[in-house]
């Protein structure tokens, strides 16, 4: 029987965290388009519901000490039609699962915001109704 190590679990938890953020953005987009009656909004809503919309999503980038949670957007400017990485959403310590708000593109802020080793904090990060794609939940309270 093979036991998974903490760093392996942290990677799995981090991927679920990205999935939660992506789902939160999808729910936000649906709510936004449901409030408008224009034909464009109806088309966007339909493409979201049938899965063909190129919505913003979140991916894990592997760093030396941290996993970097990156926001990706689909760029259609001048017919580029490619995914482009935008801003950093959060940093996750690869060995401990501690989640940090970004201070800059390359470094996390000073204090731990969440710890994925603690079950209730991990469950909150994996809940799309708790996480916010814009990152407001990462501010200290």
Features from the language model and the residues they span:
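Hydrophobic transmembrane signal anchors and adjacent membrane-proximal interface regions, especially
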Residues: 30, 38, 100-102, 114-116, ...
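A short, surface-exposed interaction/processing loop segment used at functional sites
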Residues: 96-128
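Long, terminal "pre-/pro-" and other extracytoplasmic accessory regions
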Residues: 4-5, 11, 109-110, 139-141
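Exposed beta-strand-loop-beta-strand "reactive/processing" segments of non-cytosolic proteins
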Residues: 47-90
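Cysteine/selenocysteine-centered motifs that mediate thiol-based redox chemistry or coordinate metal-sulfur cofactors
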Residues: 130-141
């Amino acid at each position: 029987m093979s036991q998974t190590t903490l760093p392996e679990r942290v990677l799995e938890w981090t991927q679920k965290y990205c999935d939660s953020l992506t789902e939160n953005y999808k729910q936000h987009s649906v709510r936004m388009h449901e409030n408008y009656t224009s034909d464009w909004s109806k088309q966007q809503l339909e493409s979201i519901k049938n899965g063909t919309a190129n919505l913003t999503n979140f991916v894990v980038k592997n760093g030396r000490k941290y996993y970097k949670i990156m926001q990706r957007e689909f760029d259609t400017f001048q017919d580029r039609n490619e995914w482009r990485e935008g801003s950093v959403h959060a940093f996750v310590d690869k060995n401990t699962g501690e989640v940090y708000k970004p201070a800059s593109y390359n470094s996390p802020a000073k204090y731990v915001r969440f710890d994925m080793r603690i079950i209730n904090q991990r469950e909150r990060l994996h809940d799309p109704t708790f996480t916010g794609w814009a990152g407001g939940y990462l501010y200290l309270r």
